[in-house]
A protein has these predicted regions:
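Alpha-helical transmembrane segments of multi-pass membrane proteins
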Residues: 1-358
Length: 358
């Protein structure tokens, strides 16, 4: 009943507000267009009602009313382009975000609670970001409001996508539905992979000015990838060995701790090999720090109760990887000092020496 009331309220708003634009065409009185701005918050309020009722937007004639409301709203925005004094750029960003959330809610509703519903939200944010990349050359509204539609809106979507990655990988995955869970080949892991690629691509190709620091621009996608691969391993243990997806059971599991040690060692090895090949000393130090954490973990956690085969395998594997690192991945040399900085430091040293003599 509440969902039906929300749909009817939205329909009533359309019936009341849209004639104001038609009337404004005749009398050209500016205040007539101002109430039309209420249509967007009414759409948002109706969405909240559906969310509270846990109902899809297509219910209660929503399949007809919501498309009509969005068409009317964007038609009103197009008409308001001719009227001065309206924050149209901000309105377009708010509209796009609300439309994205509406689509995400609708996509997640038919799916049972679990990795499919969680993946639907990530897929929605990812597709919205891709759509902006493809549509940014359109005259309206993207080129007309380029500062907000082509810069601010994608940045918000990148942030939402990163936030979705954190939430989806920290919470319990729920059920995998009727389809058996396949590690790395399930919708949640595949959506995470797509999200990492999109965030990396956006930071380095489409919006390189968002993060000017090179290490941070590589570090953010790298941190998200590290979070995802660890969560993917824990989900694999959760579904295959029936280990509860909680901190205490995972910490107490011999298989989980050995798997994490091997995974971190492989990541550290790959990171250090890549850093040696590219000459990236900071990246090598990150890999070295991860290997040090693995060694510390082996002696404080993994080997605390000796005798299990999983722990012995983990210890031997990590030891072998450390040997590979020592041979194939030596630490890269420091970056050469900037000649101008060297000259300035030399001049400063000479001036200090002359000052000491006097």
């Amino acid at each position: 009943a509440e969902g039906l009331k929300g749909s009817l309220s939205l329909l009533l708003a359309l019936v009341v507000l849209l004639p104001l634009i038609a009337l404004h065409r005749r009398v050209n009185w500016a205040p007539l267009t101002q109430p039309v701005l209420l249509l967007l918050p009414i759409i948002g309020f109706t969405l909240v009602i559906y969310v509270i009722r846990d109902e899809p937007l297509l219910a209660h004639y929503g399949w007809l009313i919501f498309p009509a409301a969005w068409a009317a709203w964007y038609g009103a925005l197009r008409y308001l382009e001719k009227q001065p004094g309206y924050p149209l750029g901000a309105l377009h960003v708010a509209s796009a975000l609300l439309l994205t959330v509406s689509i995400g809610w609708q996509l997640s509703q038919p799916l049972s609670a679990g990795i499919w519903a969680i993946s639907a939200w990530g897929l929605t944010f990812a597709l919205a970001l891709v759509a902006i990349q493809r549509l940014k050359h359109l005259g309206w509204p993207f080129q007309r409001h380029a500062a907000t539609m082509n810069t601010l809106l994608p940045r918000i979507l990148v942030g939402l996508l990163a936030l979705w990655m954190v939430i989806s990988n920290l919470q319990a995955p729920g059920s995998s539905g009727a389809i058996p869970y396949l590690p790395l080949l399930n919708p949640l892991d595949l959506t995470n992979l797509a999200a990492i690629w999109l965030i990396f691509r956006w930071l380095h190709r489409h919006d390189p000015t968002l993060i000017t620091d090179r290490q941070l621009a590589y570090g953010l996608p790298g941190a998200l990838a590290f979070l995802w691969i660890n969560a993917a391993l824990l989900r694999a243990f959760h579904f295959t060995l029936d280990i509860p997806f909680r901190f205490e059971p995972m910490l107490a599991s011999f298989a989980v701790q050995s798997g994490l040690s091997i995974l971190w060692s492989v990541i550290g090895l790959v990171t250090m090999l890549l850093a040696t090949r590219r000459g990236w000393r900071p990246l090598w130090l990150v890999g070295g720090a991860l290997m040090a954490v693995v060694v510390l973990k082996l002696f404080t956690v993994d080997m605390s109760g000796t005798g299990t085969i999983a722990r012995i395998i983990a210890f031997l594997t990590v030891g072998g990887l450390l040997l590979v690192v020592g041979y194939f991945a030596p630490v890269p040399p420091r970056a050469p000092e900037d000649p101008e900085d060297s000259d300035r430091s030399t001049i400063a040293d000479n001036s200090e020496a002359l000052h000491d003599k006097h």
